[in-house]
Amino acid sequence: MQGSVIEFLKPNLVGIEQINATRAKVTLGPLERGFGHTLGNALRRILLSSMPGTAVTEVEIDGVQHEYSTKEGVQEDILEILLNLKGLAVKLEGKDNVLVSLTKSGAGPVTAGDITHGSDVEIVNPEHVICHLTGNAEISMRIKIESGRGYVPASSRIHTEEDERPIGRLLVDATFSPVERIAYSVESARVEQRTDLDKLVIDMETDGTLDPEEAIRRAATILAEQLDAFVDLRKVSEPVAKEEKPEFDPILLRPVDDLELTVRSANCLKAETIHYIGDLVQRTEVELLKTPNLGKKSLTEIKDVLASRGLSLGMRLENWPPASLSED
């Protein structure tokens, strides 16, 4: 069938070759000459930089104050452990960030499967090695995992001097993209008498948290949405009324008494006019340790109780307190 000389061919999905659970080849064609590289390069850049995913952003290891130290009984130094933690492949369900914990003792490897987490967390690579213990050594750590996009260096998340970054909180460079490798090639294609057409072949590998086929679909959707504004430059879009969402997580509006702390810890917080959980999470460890009669034991209790609810000290809450919140 002979088409118009100005009519563009519309590509169709030629095939998907699933090489393994994390790698696939997607073939798209036929494409007009030159469009193989045009679409291939655009999709490649989006897949590498714009796919949402999860990453470890903060780590606290008992007995470790900074990343340049070592821990007795652990073969790897702290920098190696942080690097290994970056290799965790995690899925989060219904949450943007979570705190998980890991405690292990005795000689042998410490793997991602040793991490204690809730039902809203799935570790895709439980066999991933984090470190190795010798003798009767023990290691205990708390790991913060967040959702995000692209690459966010630790330097961009370091607290200001006014925030007094807590000692022992180790920030990690976060690579959120689930796409680990992608390459594309353009091959020749033929339709009837035309032999100058392109066929795009995308070879992609992910960390297992995102199916390669779904990743291609998301990248194409992002590209289409970004180009949609150019379809009708004169079109004036009307503002869409957004559904109002709670300004703060309801748990932050609850009184500190709901944490069921010991009497000593609760009284210390009330003496500092810390009445709501939202007041508490904005305080840093250094600030709390300056509170009269509040020692390290009480601080550990507070941190553990917050961690069990997916919270931590040193959080930033914009526009706190809300106008509707009444002071005790």
Curated annotation (Swiss-Prot):
It comes from Psychromonas ingrahamii (strain DSM 17664 / CCUG 51855 / 37). Keywords: DNA-directed RNA polymerase, Nucleotidyltransferase, Transcription, Transferase. GO terms for cellular component: cytoplasm; DNA-directed RNA polymerase complex. It catalyses: RNA(n) + a ribonucleoside 5'-triphosphate = RNA(n+1) + diphosphate. The lineage of its organism: Bacteria, Pseudomonadati, Pseudomonadota, Gammaproteobacteria, Alteromonadales. One of its GO terms (biological process) is DNA-templated transcription. Pfam families: RNA_pol_A_bac, RNA_pol_A_CTD, RNA_pol_L. It comes from the Bacteria. One of its GO terms (molecular function) is DNA-directed RNA polymerase activity. Gene3D superfamilies: 5' to 3' exonuclease, C-terminal subdomain, DNA-directed RNA polymerase, insert domain, RNA polymerase, RBP11-like subunit. InterPro entries: DNA-dir_RNA_pol_insert (IPR011262), DNA-dir_RNA_pol_RpoA/D/Rpb3 (IPR011263), DNA-dir_RpoA (IPR011773), RBP11-like (IPR036603), RNAP_asu_C (IPR011260), RNApol_insert_sf (IPR036643). The N-terminal domain is essential for RNAP assembly and basal transcription, whereas the C-terminal domain is involved in interaction with transcriptional regulators and with upstream promoter elements. Belongs to the RNA polymerase alpha chain family. This is DNA-directed RNA polymerase subunit alpha 2. It is an enzyme of class 2 (transferase). Transmembrane segments: none annotated. Its EC number is 2.7.7.6.
